[in-house]
A protein has these predicted regions:
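Active-site beta->alpha loop and helix N-cap motifs at the rims of alpha/beta catalytic domains
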Residues: 1-69, 77
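Catalytic alpha/beta core domains of metabolic enzymes, predominantly
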Residues: 49-57, 64-167
Length: 170
């Protein structure tokens, strides 16, 4: 996924178009963070506008209330997916209010932290998307592979400990 998001809707669209021209099809897009008090309707209109300008893209919405000031609800995500089933394909959930509660067929869910990887996999999530995976990738991969192979989890506690060490700096 190519992460896009600027302080201007038009710049966001331009960045997505540029990425699309260079072969990217899947984009991680956070709702606008430059307006306070975003509503479900406003966020719906934001994604609708992007899709109207680049209709062939696939979007993983980015739920990160701390950064964007908006927290997706199950209802808001469901409306986006129902309206744009060929475009809205998943959610990165850094707010952690959706990964356990959102149940949509053929919808990718990625918690935004290693601390939720194993639990997420156990309830049907697809994996994680985490900046800290730049450091924890071998451990996260081991947890993922062991889960897929139904092997005993030997690295999850270590993975969580490394992540929590980073969380201490937030």
């Amino acid at each position: 996924f190519l992460g896009t998001g600027c302080n201007s809707l038009n710049e966001t669209v331009d960045l997505i178009k540029y990425g699309y021209e260079y072969g990217f099809k899947d984009f991680l897009i956070m709702p606008p963070a430059y307006y306070k008090g975003n509503t479900d309707k406003g966020v719906f209109n934001f994604y609708s506008y992007i899709i109207s300008k680049i209709p062939k893209i696939k979007i993983v919405i980015y739920n990160f209330e701390h950064l964007s000031g908006y927290k997706f609800s199950v209802e808001a995500v469901t409306k986006l997916v129902t309206t744009f089933p060929n475009n809205i394909i998943g959610c990165k959930d850094s707010t952690a209010n959706l990964f356990e509660n959102l149940k949509l067929p053929n919808f990718l869910i990625f918690p935004g932290t290693e601390t939720k990887l194993l639990k997420g996999l156990e309830i049907g999530n697809s994996g994680i998307i985490s900046a800290v995976c730049n450091v924890t990738a071998p451990l996260a991969r081991k947890v993922f592979d062991d889960f897929e192979k139904k092997k005993e989890q030997t690295q999850n506690d270590k993975l969580i400990a490394v992540r929590q060490a980073f969380d201490g700096y937030n």
